[in-house]
A protein has these predicted regions:
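Arg/Lys-rich low-complexity patches in intrinsically disordered regions that function as generic
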Residues: 155-164, 173-183
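S-adenosylmethionine/decaboxylated-SAM
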Residues: 3-4, 12-154
Length: 183
């Protein structure tokens, strides 16, 4: 893979660990990986590389608030690496986050560091498929910088319609006619 930018948010070891972690998480049901926080594209390239190695049908959707002034961009690194399974979308981060968490099988969050509890609750309420969430905790980056959580959809019991109450005549007894013969 050709990461063209000199800026590295993750050490080479952490980036390799992220790629291997995601590669191990991808299974036959994985269709979308959501990355929140593109920045310079280092994690984007690793996620797309893991998806590309494991399955041609897995897409990486990378969202961020704005295009940081890093040059070369994530798109340029992806193109140089011949990886085309990724879309990078910018702007309206909160709206896009809510929209895409429903579709993602794997979510990598490298943003919202101060609001992660709030975002995890949003994920738990809205996922419709089992989803693995990887959160990069910059405070923990000396050790293992990733926290992994598996979230399953909340199955809510359906409200059943009660049939309308009608009087039934189950207790009716049929009167027998008896004839007395008189002589």
């Amino acid at each position: 893979m050709n990461y063209l930018n000199r800026f590295k948010q993750l050490s080479d070891e952490a980036a390799e660990a992220l790629q291997n972690l995601v590669k191990d998480m991808i299974n036959k049901n994985t269709t979308n990986i959501l990355e929140v926080g593109t920045y310079a594209g280092q994690a984007t390239l690793r996620l797309a590389g893991a998806a590309n190695e494991k399955s041609n049908s897995v897409r990486v959707i990378s969202i961020d608030e704005n295009h940081d002034s890093f040059s070369p961009t994530a798109e340029e690194s992806l193109k140089a690496s011949n990886i085309f399974n990724t879309s990078v979308e910018l702007g309206e981060l909160n709206k896009r986050f809510e929209e895409y968490i429903v579709r993602a099988n794997i979510i990598y969050i490298d943003r919202f560091h101060n609001k992660i509890d709030e975002k995890m609750e949003l994920i738990k309420r809205n996922v419709i498929i089992p989803t693995k969430v990887i959160f990069r905790n910059p405070k923990n980056s000396d050790d293992f910088p990733f926290e992994v959580t598996e979230v399953s959809p909340q199955v809510k019991p359906r409200a059943r319609k009660k049939p309308p109450v009608t009087e039934t005549t189950d207790d009716k007894t049929i009167a027998k006619e008896t004839k007395k013969e008189t002589t």
